Amino acid sequence: MKVLSLIFVIFSVLVLFASAKDPVCDQPKAVGRCFAAFPKFYFNSSSAQGEAFFYGGCGGNENNFNTLEECNAKCA
C-alpha cells in the first residue's frame, strides 16, 4: 500500500510539472517603444494560440518569438 501511495504521489507531481505553463506566455503583446516593424509572434492566452504582430525593435517583453512554431512550442 505504501508503494502504491508513493507511485501516486510521484505521478501527480510529474503531471503537475508537465502541465505548468511558462509565465512568459501570460504576458500581453508588447510592440515596444521604437518604430520599426519586425514581424514577430506572441502567445495570446485568451485564444490559447500564437498570433502575429509587428515588434517596434526595442522594449517590449519576453512574449516575443521569431516564428509561430517557436511560440507554440513554448506556450501551447
Curated annotation (Swiss-Prot):
Annotated disulfide bonds: C25-C75, C34-C58
Signal peptide location: 1-20
GO molecular function: serine-type endopeptidase inhibitor activity; toxin activity
Residues in coiled coil: none
Lineage: Eukaryota, Metazoa, Ecdysozoa, Arthropoda, Hexapoda
PROSITE patterns, A to Z: BPTI_KUNITZ_1, BPTI_KUNITZ_2
Intracellular or extracellular location(s): Secreted
Domain of life: Eukaryota
Organism: Tabanus yao
SUPFAM superfamilies associated with the record: BPTI-like
Claim: Signal is one of the keywords in the record: yes
Record-linked Pfam families: Kunitz_BPTI
Protein name as catalogued: Tabkunin 4
Chain ranges of the BPTI/Kunitz inhibitor domain: 25-75
Tissue-level expression: Expressed in salivary glands.
One Gene Ontology cellular component annotation held by this UniProt entry: extracellular space
Free-text function comment from the UniProt entry: Potent anticoagulant protein that inhibits the hydrolytic activities of all serine proteases tested (trypsin, thrombin, elastase, and chymotrypsin), with the highest efficacy on thrombin.
Main location group: secreted
Keywords: Blood coagulation cascade inhibiting toxin, Disulfide bond, Hemostasis impairing toxin, Protease inhibitor, Secreted, Serine protease inhibitor, Signal, Toxin
